[in-house]
């Protein structure tokens, strides 16, 4: 078999396995949502009131990640996708956690994101000599100042609309420019980051389920238990990532 045929088979197997992972993930997510809908419907009514805040936080994250991609065009694509996935999910969970005053969820999420981002960046910094250049720091500082000016000078509704438009623009541009490149540059080894995406999503799903649990005085103990479980799970996944 020619090399081109082997590459096509590898791509097909990779896509098949990733879609299987996504399908399992969706089944788990729908099962949990159905359970919460049947058992705790009043919690879902509270969740709808925080949708606008969550979307605003997501769009701010997308703008920041778009800036990262512009400032560091040579940054590894699979690392960028993992960081995008991690940051967007964590911002949504944390924003809702603040809305519901679930401190244990927020503490667990901060620990999870910190550990995962550290492992992701450290692996590539030491193994592939990825260097974050000065343009990233300059661009990030400029973006922070612009966001501060937008939220200070404009009313709340206007600033949210501007952030949403900027986030959507980044999404559309990224999809149009990168879809063909991603399809042609798929490697079978990228299955490991895909599996890690599923692992992270299941962990975030576990943290999100804590929203539907009643607040108790022992929330500090719950936070310590969740953080400890997060540390152990992340440490167990790190050898797979490095390999």
Curated annotation (Swiss-Prot):
GO terms for cellular component: host cell membrane; membrane. It holds the Pfam family Bax1-I. The chain crosses the membrane at residues 20-40, 47-67, 80-100, 106-126, 143-163, 164-184, 192-212. Keywords: Host membrane, Membrane, Transmembrane, Transmembrane helix. The keyword ATP-binding does not apply. InterPro entries: Bax_inhibitor_1-related. It is a multi-pass membrane protein. Belongs to the cytomegalovirus US12 family. This is Membrane protein US21. It is found in: Host membrane. The gene is US21. It comes from the Viruses.
């Amino acid at each position: 078999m020619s090399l081109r045929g082997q590459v096509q088979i590898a791509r097909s197997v990779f896509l098949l396995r990733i879609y299987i992972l996504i399908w399992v993930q969706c089944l788990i997510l729908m099962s949990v949502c159905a359970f919460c809908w049947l058992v705790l419907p009043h919690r879902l009514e509270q969740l709808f009131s925080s949708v606008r805040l969550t979307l605003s936080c997501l769009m701010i994250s997308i703008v920041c990640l778009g800036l990262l991609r512009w400032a560091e065009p040579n940054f590894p694509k699979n690392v960028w996708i993992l960081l995008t996935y991690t940051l967007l999910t964590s911002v949504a969970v944390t924003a809702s956690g603040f809305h519901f005053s679930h401190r244990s969820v927020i503490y667990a999420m901060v620990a999870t994101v910190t550990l995962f981002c550290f492992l992701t960046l450290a692996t590539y910094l030491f193994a592939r000599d990825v260097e974050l250049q000065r343009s990233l720091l300059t661009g990030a500082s400029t973006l922070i100042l612009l966001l501060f000016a937008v939220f200070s000078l404009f009313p709340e509704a206007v600033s949210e609309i501007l952030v949403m438009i900027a986030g959507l623009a980044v999404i559309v541009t990224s999809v149009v420019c990168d879809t063909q490149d991603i399809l042609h540059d798929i490697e079978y080894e990228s299955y490991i980051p895909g599996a890690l995406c599923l692992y992270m999503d299941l962990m975030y799903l576990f943290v999100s389920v804590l929203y539907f649990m009643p607040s108790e005085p022992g929330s500090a103990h719950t936070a310590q238990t969740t953080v400890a479980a997060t540390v152990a799970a992340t440490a167990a996944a790190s050898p797979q990532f490095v390999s």
